[in-house]
């Protein structure tokens, strides 16, 4: 039983206590900031975004996780960008296909393997306007050693995380 948990670093204490109370071990995988993912030949590939309002004229591709779970008060929306210029897509390959074919589109993305960026003709750009630190951790019951196949998966996960474009 393995799970990958992603959260804002600022919420680390909450998740650490949550997992400890439930007898779950947390193993860090990587820390990162979301980056702007866009077509390598599009206008955003050459532009540095210093304020999120600069993205208002571009089309945002959103995955189904654009709201943060458990947000009390506020609207739970991760970042406020023009809601009139959004495409909601629930399948990762379709997102990449849209980004590939629509040079004025972008999405917020976690680190990715270089081979995926090359395959879909995309670029991952750091964005000074979005600096939220995120953390991926592997979570599993703290009941001794992992089975060999679980440990092989964990080792592969660490290897892939280390080789991603951040």
Q: What does each model-identified segment do?
A:
Residues 1-2, 36, 55, 138, ...:
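Residue-level signal for nonpolar/aromatic packing positions in well-ordered secondary structure
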Residues 6-8, 12, 45-46, 50-81, ...:
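Secondary-structure junction motif
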Residues 22-31, 109-111, 119-133, 142:
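Short beta-strand->loop
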Residues 7-23:
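Ligand-binding clamshell of periplasmic/extracellular solute-binding protein-like
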Residues 1, 65-124:
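Hydrophobic hinge/microswitch elements
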Residues 18-60:
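Flexible hinge/capping segments at coil-to-helix
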Residues 123-165:
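A late-sequence structural motif
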Residues 6-8, 40, 63-67, 110-111, ...:
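Structural motif
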